Amino acid sequence: METNYQKFLAGEYCNHLDQEVLQMIVQTKNLLARLNATNITDSATRDALLRQMLGSIGKYSSIDINFHCECGKHIFIGDKVIINMNCTFLDDNIIKIGNNVLIAPNVQLYTATHPINANERFVNDWDERSGDLFFRTKALPITIDRKS
């Protein structure tokens, strides 16, 4: 049987309140708090925090101040990538950014999605004791190819 985390990565509907997923999010939020409180000139500390939090980050790549993400470890950044200030990456699934990519300020990348039709989006027979969400959500991967 697939875990909720495996369902997320497979692009299937799943429960975002699963303990495995929540634990990953909390750990990432703690690292983000440290990253965003670190002086932008302290590149050694910022680099160490990014390497601990992200799936990978390439050579000569940087992320500016006020960065936010969900899980962190689903973000893979190539070489010579600049992610400007105030960016948000909701990485419930994989986000791959190729080499030589420049990302402007305030860019938001969301892997999470919901059905557009409200009848499909909400669980009609939802029971609050079930531990499940009252709405359906899934996550799909994002790829930004090189030199974008």
Regions found by a protein language model. Give the residues of each.
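Flexible, glycine/small-residue-enriched loop-and-beta-strand segment within the central core
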Residues: 67-77, 82-147
